[in-house]
Amino acid sequence: MEQNNLIEQFQKLEPLVVATADYELQMRLQQLRDTYGTMLRYMVQGMDDPNASRIYNDLVSQAHVLGDRAERVLRIQKQSSDRYVITYKTLRAEVSLSDMVGKLRNYNEALRLLRDEPNERENIQQHDVEQHQRGREEMLLMLFGRVWTSDVWSKSEQETALSMLMDDVVFTEDKCVLISATTLALQEMFDERKLMLLFDAYLLPELELSQRALVGMMIALRQHNERIKQQPEVQSRFSLLCDDANFVRDTFRVFMQMQYSRLTDTVSEKMRSDIIPTILQSTKFKQTQFGIEELDDYLTQNGENPEWFKNRMADTRAQAKIQEMGEMLMEGADVYMSTFSQMKNNVFFQQIAHWFYPFSADLPAVADILGRLGGETSSVFGAMLRYAPFCDSDKFSFTFMLSMIGVQGQEGLSKSLTGSLSHDELSEMLETKKTKKRAADISRQYIFDLYRFFTLYPFHQQFQNPFNKELPQFTPLAHDVFQPLLNNYDEVLSLAEFFMRKGVYQEAIDLFEHLLPQKVEEDVDLWQKIGFCEQKQGRLEEAFESYKTAYDLNPNSQWTLKHLASVSFQGEWYSEAEVYYQLLLDDDPDNLRYLRRKAGCLMKQNLFDEAIPLLYKALYLDENSVEDQNNLAWCQLHEGQFDKARELYGKVLSTHADQPSAHFNLACTYLAEGNIQQAYPLFREAYLMQSVSDDGDAQFVRDFNEAFDELQPVSNMDNERGQALLDAVRLGI
């Protein structure tokens, strides 16, 4: 179908439509064939129809829709265990969408009246409220199921849904559920009218509705990119929205938030294995033992209690991890997934619709629990549910957890939450009403809700997961429908930088390159960032060229110069790297890293005599550096300065006798001098220390042969004697 070959489409559709035994679908297929036949007859008769192209595209689109509808009918007929089919079959066909919306509106209106009217008989009023709440809940579940499992909408159904969104009587929470049901329905099959409803919902003044609609819209557009190529009205509507700076900003933010949610597994693993264990080690969490035995021994000898220091160290580390967790949360990471993922077994979550409910204390399942809490405890948890940065799904989980831990557990948890607050701070928290959420918070937390559904719902495998890592990344370059967004330089740049920070380097490069960097000084940053991403990918030659372009445009950038030197060294272009490290040393002559890197470049080029002064200077700056001593001794060996090399290697051995390399390096000095008698025991000791590892013998042979080959120019030992010495060392002669 994607090739837009109508004859082939009709031939493929026929057995599918016939299998449904649905007369309406069969007649629809015949109508499409007849229309196409009429169009072809006009063409062969030489009649020029200016609408031919539009009619053809419309036929292609309708053929797609017919295929979707036929597949849906067959699914309902044959897949009885599918949650979609089960939900569809439990709904009464004679109850229309309009009827459901009308009844739901009546419940909403009654609840508003009961809340606003003073009633002396409070018990009767409360009974009425509960009765209407349960009726509202039942109707909302039916509405969700009807919309999710619906066929393509008629014009009247679209108008009914839109009227519900525009109705001031209907609660915002109920409208949110309608938007989520529409989003889920679009995952099952493309429906232009449902997609248009999301466009309309984005324009509503309530942020809870507009942001939820935007997320659903982006998921649907991404999934149905190919279909939308035959939908000029959808393309036109999206392009029109792209003229709105607020829409563009919101859309790019959702791209980042959706992309970040793909990293939730990584974030959860860090929370489980690093952040939470470290925080729990703090004395504030009654943890006192950390197994720092060396510190224990040292402090005990001096008479101090080691627990004092352990607790202080643990508190410091915990504070750092709490700060890190806060920074992750501020950036948009889903840090609570690992905590609440174990709390989705409540019967409440057996209903698909409940995964998409905005949290509300009025829901019967929640009201029953919160109503049984004590006075201050109830206030504390109520405030927490207002302030905590939890998504709605996690707020439900938290509430259900309260019902399981009992009164004592509730009081203990309440005290732990408020223990660090002063009386005034606690009073302010309890008295402050719910603050208005920002658009970014609403969309992020809704995306968290979606992520939980598509990964934790028991039958989640029956749904197309938009967070699946096998799908393209969340970038406007991945789908044609998002092309109008690419005209916004600053937003594209921000998204590219986001991808770069998150290690999604190819998409970052593509976005940077879309900005068409020119060889002018104003674009130096772009060339630097492209080079950085290319270097991270291991594309060293391309990274070098990007860095070189940036350097030519601005030779005063130390950052560019450092990366030019680094990528040259990494690419083993040592002569170029030497030049760049010297330029860095000209500006910072005592920089140890630059001294060592330049010396390394010279050694790789066998310019040992030029490397020696650099290594002497490095040792002067860091006299205890074993690395510099070994490198200097190696250069001296190659220059025939055997006494100096032996002295340095001997010094290293005296302080690092437990390291095989210390014995091996000194043995090489004697090997270069041809003194096998002195070399053998040192080689043998290195071999015995190294051979305990699995690959120790093979690694020693590789090291010996490499050293032997490198020392050949200054050694008189031939290959046969070298092999004999190696065999003797391995056999322990």
What are these regions (language model features)?
Residues H514-P517, K548-D552, Q582-D586, Y616-Y620, ...:
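Conserved structural position within tetratricopeptide repeats
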Residues A213, E491, D525-L526, T560, ...:
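TPR alpha-solenoid repeat register
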Residues H354-W559, H563:
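Alpha-solenoid helical-repeat scaffolds
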